[in-house]
Structure formats: structure tokens, C-alpha cells
Regions:
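Membrane-interacting alpha-helical segments
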Residues: 1-7, 61, 147
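Alpha-helical bundle segments that constitute or directly flank the non-heme di-iron/ferroxidase center
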Residues: 2-31, 92-116
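A structural signal for well-ordered alpha-helices, especially hydrophobic packing surfaces
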Residues: 21, 51, 55-58, 79-82, ...
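Short, flexible helix-adjacent loops and helix caps
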Residues: 25, 29-36, 59, 63, ...
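Carboxylate-rich helix-loop segments that flank metal/cofactor sites and access channels
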Residues: 52, 56-95, 99-105
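Preference for long, well-ordered alpha-helical segments
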Residues: 97-152
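N-terminal amphipathic/hydrophobic targeting modules at extreme N-termini
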Residues: 149-166
Length: 170
């Protein structure tokens, strides 16, 4: 049970890191503020360091890791691009990053609870990843804005059997 939970927890961290790095990559070209840019790059570098640690452990268990859920990755890409089209600003990027980090923290805590039998090293990596996400949220708070232009309601409907996606904005 320990080995099984350890592998499952490491795989979820692996997928989460890949999702986080991809999300940062999606927005870096749009960041205007140099401090904000450096903050995101530093966070990405820290994610990459944790990814290396995870890969070493996954290799030890002869596991290839896990890719992010394609649906989640696609929805994230759509949300990012729609919001940036509506308002290409550091405030929008900070809002997107904050939402992503909060979702990551929530998911990682659920996995810690779910895979209680995982070894301490994998739990430690998960906790460090959670702290990294929480730190980014704190570091970018100054870029958040309450401006009306930065917030809009949106609703996504998908019909995926025939690969059709309809996006409604209001």
C-alpha cells in the first residue's frame, strides 16, 4: 500500500507541476511588469527543480509519471486566452495565476488526504509544492485589481463526442 500510494501521489504532483509550468509559459509573453515577470520565472524554475526530484523517485519505481488531464489543460488554455483577449494586462494574468494556484493547492491537499500511506519523502515534496503555489499567490497579490474590466462572467458548454466546443461569454 505504501508503494502504491507513493507512486500515485508522485504522479499527481508530476501532472500538477506540468500544468503549472504550462500555465506560466502561456502567460509569460504577456507580462509587462519586470518584477512580475521575474516572479513567474522564479516560480517556474522552482517547479522544474521539484519536477527533477519527482522524476528521480518515479524512475526508482519504474513509473513514467503522469500528464495533466487533457480536458483540464484545454479548458485552462481557453480560459487564459479568452481572458487575455478581453483584457491583456498584468491584472488579468495575476487573476489567472491566483485561480490556478488555488486550484492546485486544493487538489494537492486532497491527494495528501487520499494517499495517506505514501512515504514521507513524497508527502514532503507535495507539501513543498503546495507552499510554492501559496507563495506565488502571496507574491502576486499586488498585481490583482478589482477593476470591472478585469472580471467578467463566462460559461463554457462542451459537447465533446463530435469535438465541438461552444463558448458563451456574458
Amino acid at each position: 500500500m505504501i508503494e502504491s500510494d507513493t507512486i500515485k501521489l508522485l504522479r499527481e504532483c508530476d501532472a500538477g507541476i506540468k500544468m503549472g509550468v504550462a500555465s506560466i509559459d502561456d502567460v509569460l509573453d504577456y507580462v509587462n511588469d519586470r518584477t512580475f515577470f521575474k516572479c513567474l520565472v522564479n516560480c517556474k524554475d522552482e517547479h522544474d527543480k521539484l519536477k527533477e526530484e519527482i522524476q528521480i523517485l518515479l524512475d526508482k519505481y519504474h513509473d513514467d509519471g503522469k500528464e495533466p488531464n487533457p480536458m483540464a489543460k484545454g479548458m485552462s488554455w481557453i480560459k487564459t486566452n479568452v481572458k487575455l483577449v478581453m483584457n491583456e494586462s498584468d491584472e488579468t494574468i495575476a487573476d489567472l495565476m491566483t485561480d490556478g494556484c488555488n486550484m492546485g493547492v486544493k487538489s494537492l491537499n486532497k491527494y495528501l488526504n487520499q494517499y495517506k500511506a505514501a512515504n514521507e519523502k513524497s508527502k514532503d515534496i507535495t507539501k513543498r509544492l503546495i507552499k510554492l503555489e501559496e507563495k506565488l499567490v502571496i507574491d502576486i497579490r499586488g498585481f490583482l485589481s478589482a477593476s470591472k474590466n478585469n472580471h467578467f462572467k463566462w460559461l463554457l458548454f462542451g459537447y465533446f463526442k463530435n469535438q465541438t466546443l461552444i463558448v458563451f461569454l456574458y
